[in-house]
Amino acid sequence: MGTGSSISTSNGNIIINGFGGDLSSASSAHGVSISGGTIIAGGAGTVVLHGEGGKAGTSSDGVNMTTSPAKITSDGGSVTVTGIGGGAGASASCSGVAVLTGAQISAGGSGIVVVQGTGGLGIGALNYGVEVSGVGALITSNGGAVQVTGNGGTLGTVTGNNHGVIVDNSGKIRAAGAGATTVTGFGGGTNATLSNYGVLVNNSGEISATGTGHVIINGTGGFGSGNFNGGVALSNSGFISSSGGNV
């Protein structure tokens, strides 16, 4: 979906399923790609969106969102986004759900936001479960809970950096009002791979609750025998906070 394109309802639900192609020469075979487009469920409508990246190419995310005003949102219903990264062989950079510069997943009113992603099955690096990266990249709510769960690609045997959830380069995950923010991540990788964090908050990335809600983070490092397979890591001004709740 490019800039200016939209899918919307006035009071109904939106259900979208997308699957990338499987040609061995294909790259960026995202299951669902939103580049400046918008998906909006009005009234009490909900959004359920699922994407699976192509099984052969590299850089094939399950769900890929980028470029303002790209967004998936509701007026008050729940928003659920799930994705499975594609790839095979030496494929890399196949995230389950990638929310990149200028893109947002949100819910209005008391609607909850659920995002779940599983990194691709290639043996390369950067097969994140959920990636929130870049200025304006945001997963948020107006008053409901925000729940993000990511599983890094488990077949990464050559290099590491298959994080469960990465919040990077000023990307943000946050709930407002009474909503709690819960982030759960499982690092991927096998053999001697390293730097497969469960949850990594890096380069001014932020996980927060701006109201009275709590922040709950659970991270499990990858299974490789290399270094830095930590559960939860903050680096380079990464930020975790709650304005009125516990962390």
Regions found by a protein language model. Give the residues of each.
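Surface-exposed loop/turn motifs in large extracellular/passenger domains
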Residues: M1-V247
